[in-house]
Amino acid sequence: MNNKKTVTNRKGMIPNRLNKFSIRKYSVGTASILVGTTLIFGLSGHEAKAAEHTNGELNQSKNETTAPSENKTTEKVDSHQLKDNTQTATADQPKVTMSDSATFKETSSNMQSPQNATASQSTTQTSNVTTNDKSSTTYSNETDKSNLTQAKDVSATPKTTTIKPRTLNRMAVNTVAAPQQGTNVNDKVHFSNIDIAIDKGHLNKDTGKTEFWATSSDVLKLKANYTIDDSVKEGDTFTFKYGQYFRPGSVRLPSQTQNLYNAQGNIIAKGIYDSTTNTTTYTFTNYVDQYTNVSGSFEQVAFAKRENATTDKTAYKMEVSLGNDTYSEEIIVDYGNKKAQPLISSTNYINNEDLSRNMTAYVNQPKNTYTKQTFVTNLTGYKFNPNAKNFKIYEVTDQNQFVDSFTPDTSKLKDVTNQFNITYSNDNKTATVDLMNGQTSSNKQYIIQQVAYPDNTSTDNGKIDYTLDTDKTKYSWSNSYSNVNGSSTANGDQKKYNLGDYVWEDTNKDGKQDANEKGIKGVYVILKDSNGKELDRTTTDENGKYQFTGLSNGTYSVEFSTPAGYTPTTANAGTDDAVDSDGLTTTGVIKDADNMTLDSGFYKTPKYSLGDYVWYDSNKDGKQDSTEKGIKGVKVTLQNEKGEVIGTTETDENGKYRFDNLDSGKYKVIFEKPAGLTQTGTNTTEDDKDADGGEVDVTITDHDDFTLDNGYYEEETSDSDSDSDSDSDSDSDSDSDSDSDSDSDSDSDSDSDSDSDSDSDSDSDSDSDSDSDSDSDSDSDSDSDSDSDSDSDSDSDSDSDSDSDSDSDSDSDSDSDSDSDSDSDSDSDSDTDSDSDSDSDSDSDSDSDSDSDSDSDSDSDSDSDSDSDSDSDSDSDSDSDSESDADSDTDSDSDAGKHTPAKPMSTVKDQHKTAKALPETGSENNNSNNGTLFGGLFAALGSLLLFGRRKKQNK
């Protein structure tokens, strides 16, 4: 294969050892990937921050957040992305603010105008909010920061989810995925470090305590850390229970929908706030099925519950139960009610649905007597709805009914609305009431409540102006509202629609829904608006159906998650949008009707296999031969493209191995070399018959691959022992006995010539050639024993007796020639060529012992009376030549550490095979032997001369 990589392995030789395959098991671990996410308790984007001011001018808070220009408030998410951290258990996250859509500021102006027509003056008096005795005061009232929620140090680890397809009921076209019924898991959501803190706060110098000034931009913040047990599932619930004097939100009432978001705007849990019980119940989404180890901390904006915490400068017990954890803290509350003011108003609350302003005005708290009282309301950017009958006038009969929180118990007030004529003008933007109602004078006190609805035609955020025109002074109070990025208003109830449909298994992969194809349960579906903000999420039911409800006209985005083990089918196949697949992400438009055409199809991802064979390559040719067998128990490891181990196995008794359930992609196969074996040659022939090496890279593309093989052969052992023993024994014994007796009376001429020639030549030649070339195990023992024994015994006995009276001529010639030739030649050549390791020790011992013994005994007796001439010539030549030649050549080529002895030995020894025992002599004693022989001959010659002389004398 082109994707294979040849790897060179080490070689080694271990002689005479049993090769064993050492197999180790390998376990695959699952790494948990830590994903840091930031969770936020949001207030569903329907709440506004509001500030109330009494100085007649608009003060814009720098801490206010932005809002889109739509009816509903939109929560903004910090654009910081989550940072994954695979090294630590948690990941630090940036603070994320879930802001409500509009930051509203209310500005109130109080102006007194004297009735003197000749000097009409307008004065504005301001004083510190802590001052209660000024007739005209500037106040800073409520700032709604209900959605200013920050999350810190939140982490979550993704879960692995397996989704199985279920049978689809194709008849249930309009059925909706039923919400999963979970259990209360207050005991599985754990809170710690709970605190209720005053954001900003105002220090009372008299008491030294920090107070919560509800109408001066202060808010309360509920803070806590939390962890969620991994056993929590989609549909499980937990609760936030607020106490008697404490609630979520701010001037704007908390929305019924209070969702829990992470930093990217994904919904973790959907909350429903019940104002009756002052409790929020959160239901977990499928987010908790996708992630483990979810933990974090949060801050949630909260407010004093005005209807219960009614009195300024009073400490109230702010209590909350988060899950099963309870916390309380006493907070001093001040609303800034100035009882000396003839006209003062406040925003009682802002409705979280239609953003209407529910106003409360206190008229004549000082109980002054007037002969003229005209109450006028002018709206800018708002309108009254006369048909709603929500302009109420209550007569105060008890001074205590002017509660500081501007939330009087109207059930205890006297409703006198019908006694007055309310005149609407200026397109319902102005309302006028004559509070004298025909009386000449009056000191009556009133509480007037109104509802102002946003005017969609307004280009600004509007304001509400009040005037109380009396016979003494004209008082004015103005309430203005502004947001940072535009108004978010609504007028009337819009019709809601549904969006969704179906996720199915496209078994034939044609991208179309067929009658026999079933739905897939458990697919995550996310709904987003046109700006990419997540609005909702759900999970397909057992029939593959899903549905989002309560949607207005507009453009939406739907995202489908890919179920485990599936692949998205072809998108937009054919022309029928109702039966095709719209892909993983699609856009749906709602235009005065439900849109139930957003489908997605998936087919089961094909799985492939990989593997083949590990064999014993006995002939080391790198090819699989029919006679070669597989190797059992070889460990094979499979890695993915990232180098992560995804499987291990061992070859079976036939050398086969296999990995299954693999996706198309890049892999690496690693063979663990068995102990005692050597990697054979790689890529020597066709891909399905060769060896691919110890590590092989392979790419699977829509097919199986059974060509990944590897071969090994056993390491060789060579034992070569060459022993050459050459024994040459040469024994040369030359015995010459010459007896010459000459008796001459007159003239005797005796010539005795004794020539003894002993020549011993011992040549021992032993040629042992041992050549061992073995690939596996060769034991060659070459033993050459050459024994050459030469025993030459020459015995010459010459007896010459001459008796002559006159002339005797005796000639004795003795010639003894002993020739012994022993040739011993030892040539040991040991040549070992091995792939392993051969250590050849060549020891050549050549011992040549030649013993040549020449014994010449000459007895000459000469008796001559007259003249004797004796010439005795004895020539004895003993030549011993012993040549021993031992040549040992050992050639060893090896890579490993094993030893092979080779001992050629050539030995030449002296052995005697005659009965006579001669002294042991070496070749270096030849000169000594010759001297002895010549000495004997000279002695014989002397005897003859003496004998001849004596005969002459006798003569």
UniProtKB/Swiss-Prot annotation:
Cell surface-associated calcium-binding protein which plays an important role in adhesion and pathogenesis. Mediates interactions with components of the extracellular matrix such as host NRXN1 to promote bacterial adhesion. Residues 685-695, 712-894 have a biased composition (Acidic residues). The keyword Calcium applies. Pfam families: Big_8, Gram_pos_anchor, SdrD_B, SdrG_C_C, YSIRK_signal. Residues 1-50 form the signal peptide. It comes from Staphylococcus aureus (strain MW2). A motif (LPXTG sorting signal) lies at residues 918-922. The gene is sdrC. Belongs to the serine-aspartate repeat-containing protein (SDr) family. GO terms for cellular component: extracellular region. This is Serine-aspartate repeat-containing protein C. The modification Pentaglycyl murein peptidoglycan amidated threonine is found at T921.
